[in-house]
Each structure stands twice: as C-alpha cells, then as structure tokens.
C-alpha cells in the first residue's frame, strides 16, 4: 500500500437495510489503520488496490432490471486525498455490482461494524 494514498483515506460509512432509520455507522482510516469497521487492515489493503471504488454507475450504462432490496449506504470522507460523497443502492444490476465491489466496507445491508 502506498503510504501517501493510505494517509489520505478517511471514511465515514452509514448503512440502512431499509433506506430509513435506523442507520448503522462506522469509520475507516488508512495510514495509520484505524476506525470502527471490522477487518480494518484488510479493508485498507483492498481499497489500495481499487481504481475508483466510489465512482457512480456511468449514465450510459446498460443495466439489468433486477431489484436487490431497499438497502442504502453512504460513504463520505477522503480517498487518496480526494473528497468522497457516494450513495450506494441496489436498484438494478449495475448498482448491485457497484455495491458488491465495496461490500467489505458497507456489508450486505447489515451493519458494517461486524
């Protein structure tokens, strides 16, 4: 893991299995590794190998019409020194794939504090 990238990562995570209260909250920092999320070091390693884990689904993406549930997750903070404000939902195949790519952070609808 690059130290500069790790030092510039500080995330606040909120997850709701219903899209409404109650929300489950967790944090993650990388460089040094810290926060309340389980498996912090592994999460930092996974993030360091990802190109753009918080990028939205492209507007021109062709997505399957599949519903994955009412879950909502929000990730706010910095990643590699860049501001992050990302919302994850499971409303179609593209959004489900995007959610699954960072499920080590946001879980599968349950609390990320495992």
Q: Which residues fall in each region the model found?
A:
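N- and C-terminal low-complexity/disordered segments
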Residues: 1-114
């Amino acid at each position: 893991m690059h130290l500069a990238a790790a030092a510039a990562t500080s995330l606040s995570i909120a997850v709701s299995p219903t899209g409404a209260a109650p929300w489950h909250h967790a944090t993650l920092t990388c460089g040094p590794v810290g926060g309340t999320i389980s498996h912090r070091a592994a999460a930092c390693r996974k993030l360091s190998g990802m190109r753009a884990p918080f990028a939205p689904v492209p507007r021109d993406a062709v997505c399957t019409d599949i519903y994955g549930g009412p879950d909502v997750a929000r990730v706010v903070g910095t990643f590699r020194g860049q501001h992050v404000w990302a919302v994850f939902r499971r409303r179609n195949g593209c959004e489900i794939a995007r959610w699954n790519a960072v499920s080590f952070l946001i879980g599968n609808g349950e609390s990320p504090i495992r």
